[in-house]
Amino acid sequence: MSNSRQHQGHFARKRFGQNFLVDHGVIDSIVTTIGPARGQRMVEIGPGLGALTEPLIARLATPESPLHAVELDRDLIGRLQQRFGPLLELHAGDALAFDFRSLAAPGDKPSLRIVGNLPYNISSPLLFHLMTFADAVIDQHFMLQNEVVERMVAEPGTKAFSRLSVMLQYRYVMEKMLDVPPESFQPPPKVDSAIVRMIPYEPHELPDVDPVLLGELVTAAFSQRRKMLRNTLGDYRETIDFDGLGFDLARRAEDVSVAEYVGVAQALAARRKAAE
């Protein structure tokens, strides 16, 4: 596989984190994993040169119910419009600022399926942005750096368990689906990749906790991950009765389960409300 940054006459742009998928066997496996069906409301983030776009459109799109795609590179937008016409509705812009809820069906029922080969340089911020639309989403399938996927699905007590693990596991059921080697791309990235499936919990399955408050607490806990929680969560000791919660501060952030973090965030919310 050539290391050239040019593919199909387009130069991959480093600032957009572009690595184009070119292995047709891998593409077929990804599409099979996604399982698109006619009439579904699907959004592709970063369609690039259309490697996934084409088989997705073949499986689900009609002029009345097109595949939606969010693309930042205006050079690619023109090519995609010309190639796919009314079967692809393109939204020019940055996925980090895009309102995905605007593409959902009317009503409260989740309707969006979101897919994409996400730019690795913005993957974590984009995953957090997408969390704000989780109630409108049926599922998500993303190509990501393998290291990021391993962190997403990591168990407590492992080195890979992180702030990303806690926040995403609170909101989604996640599963690593496929490994994708560098030679599947043009130009080949310097890292291994993987496909992850993310299914949001339904409202009745979610714990009653403020996600902003949970994020505040988890960020503090992991701010110095080699230190004990008595240090990183020290500012909360006057507010929260950790002993009463049975929460051991003589641990590191990676040793605490998602449920325990949720419990502490709930206790913090109750104390702050009582102090109002």
Swiss-Prot record:
<dbReference type="InterPro" id="IPR020598">
    <property type="entry name" value="rRNA_Ade_methylase_Trfase_N"/>
</dbReference>
<feature type="binding site">
    <location>
        <position position="94"/>
    </location>
    <ligand>
        <name>S-adenosyl-L-methionine</name>
    </ligand>
</feature>
<feature type="binding site">
    <location>
        <position position="21"/>
    </location>
    <ligand>
        <name>S-adenosyl-L-methionine</name>
    </ligand>
</feature>
<feature type="binding site">
    <location>
        <position position="117"/>
    </location>
    <ligand>
        <name>S-adenosyl-L-methionine</name>
    </ligand>
</feature>
<dbReference type="InterPro" id="IPR011530">
    <property type="entry name" value="rRNA_adenine_dimethylase"/>
</dbReference>
<dbReference type="GO" id="GO:0003723">
    <property type="term" value="F:RNA binding"/>
</dbReference>
<feature type="binding site">
    <location>
        <position position="19"/>
    </location>
    <ligand>
        <name>S-adenosyl-L-methionine</name>
    </ligand>
</feature>
<keyword id="KW-0808">Transferase</keyword>
<feature type="binding site">
    <location>
        <position position="46"/>
    </location>
    <ligand>
        <name>S-adenosyl-L-methionine</name>
    </ligand>
</feature>
<dbReference type="InterPro" id="IPR029063">
    <property type="entry name" value="SAM-dependent_MTases_sf"/>
</dbReference>
<keyword id="KW-0698">rRNA processing</keyword>
<dbReference type="InterPro" id="IPR023165">
    <property type="entry name" value="rRNA_Ade_diMease-like_C"/>
</dbReference>
<keyword id="KW-0694">RNA-binding</keyword>
<dbReference type="GO" id="GO:0005829">
    <property type="term" value="C:cytosol"/>
</dbReference>
<protein>
    <recommendedName>
        <fullName>Ribosomal RNA small subunit methyltransferase A</fullName>
        <ecNumber>2.1.1.182</ecNumber>
    </recommendedName>
</protein>
<feature type="binding site">
    <location>
        <position position="71"/>
    </location>
    <ligand>
        <name>S-adenosyl-L-methionine</name>
    </ligand>
</feature>
<keyword id="KW-0489">Methyltransferase</keyword>
<comment type="similarity">
    <text>Belongs to the class I-like SAM-binding methyltransferase superfamily. rRNA adenine N(6)-methyltransferase family. RsmA subfamily.</text>
</comment>
<dbReference type="Pfam" id="PF00398">
    <property type="entry name" value="RrnaAD"/>
</dbReference>
<keyword id="KW-0963">Cytoplasm</keyword>
<dbReference type="GO" id="GO:0052908">
    <property type="term" value="F:16S rRNA (adenine(1518)-N(6)/adenine(1519)-N(6))-dimethyltransferase activity"/>
</dbReference>
<keyword id="KW-0949">S-adenosyl-L-methionine</keyword>
<comment type="function">
    <text>Specifically dimethylates two adjacent adenosines (A1518 and A1519) in the loop of a conserved hairpin near the 3'-end of 16S rRNA in the 30S particle. May play a critical role in biogenesis of 30S subunits.</text>
</comment>
<dbReference type="InterPro" id="IPR001737">
    <property type="entry name" value="KsgA/Erm"/>
</dbReference>
